Amino acid sequence: MRIIIDGDACPVIDLAESIAHKFNIELILFCDYNHDIKLNYGRVVKVDQSYQSVDMKIINFAKRKDIIITDDYGLASLALSKKASAINSKGKIYTDKNIDTLLMKRHINKKIRRAGGRHPTVKKRSKKNDEKFKINLIRLIKDIK
């Protein structure tokens, strides 16, 4: 088991790093060359800035029982297809039961935007999000071990 972070815009890097260290789990953060991210525990893998390059590198690197931290539904879906687990930065665990609905919502929202419409925006992060993330990441780790 490894924890893999889609690090380009991840607000829970520090939390994930401390939990990985606590459980002695390998931590790998992927980001493009425009980000200067340093970790005290784990390693950073930098990739080209091209479209989807971080996601493609992560999915090619991921394997069964890994935990992927991402807010990208497409990447989460691919992770699940590889029998890895996926969780977002607010602590929502992606599953085979909820990923199709999330992908459909994303598709519908994209169509609304293209037609000039608007849809509800993402709410500001809260301490509750951090707490839920911590609880659910630890739950995933314990379930996999």
Annotate the PLM regions:
Residues 2-145:
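Nuclease catalytic cores that cleave nucleic-acid phosphodiester bonds
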